[in-house]
């Protein structure tokens, strides 16, 4: 259990390091390359599926750092790439079984995609980068926690 937690943290930190090490500091929406958001989205989805593979599983629910990955992706990589990664992670979640938790994850993904996109439209006008990242992270974690609470109360 602790090993999976450390593997997830390591995967997240390595993906952040490699992104900032090998990318141009110009934001994606200002670049001319149209294929770059798709490439970054596929990379985000691939990292999310790897994190899901090494997640901690309790009662069929996978616990990992995908929420953090999505918050960082929405803030620093861009909306289009993060949404592509979110779709890829959601499809990858169905590889682990077609159960009610997978469909709950689909609903969470739709909400996180819509709310994070709206937040990134309004937050930069009022807050600095760190505050925006904290708000996105809290949104993702609270949404996941609330959905997990609803799912667990319906089981009993």
Protein language model features and the residues they cover:
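Hydrophobic transmembrane alpha-helices
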Residues: 1-70, 81-156
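Aromatic-enriched hydrophobic runs in primary sequence
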Residues: 14-15, 19-22, 74-81, 85-89
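Structural signal for the C-terminal ends of transmembrane alpha-helices
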Residues: 17-28, 77, 118-125
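Generic transmembrane alpha-helix motif of multi-pass integral membrane proteins
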Residues: 65-82, 116
């Amino acid at each position: 259990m602790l090993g999976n937690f450390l593997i997830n943290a390591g995967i997240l930190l390595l993906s952040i390091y490699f992104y900032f090490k090998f990318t141009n500091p110009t934001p994606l929406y200002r670049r001319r390359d149209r294929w770059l958001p798709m490439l970054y989205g596929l990379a985000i989805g691939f990292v999310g599926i790897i994190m899901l593979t090494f997640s901690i599983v309790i009662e069929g629910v996978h616990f990992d750092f995908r929420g953090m990955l999505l918050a960082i992706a929405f803030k620093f990589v861009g909306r289009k790439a993060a949404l592509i990664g979110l779709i890829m992670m959601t499809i990858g979640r169905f590889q682990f079984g077609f159960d009610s938790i997978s469909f709950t994850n689909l609903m969470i993904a739709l909400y996180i995609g819509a709310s994070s996109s709206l937040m990134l439209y309004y937050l930069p006008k009022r807050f600095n980068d760190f505050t925006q990242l904290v708000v996105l992270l809290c949104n993702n974690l609270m949404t996941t926690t609330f959905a997990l609470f609803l799912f667990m109360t319906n089981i009993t």
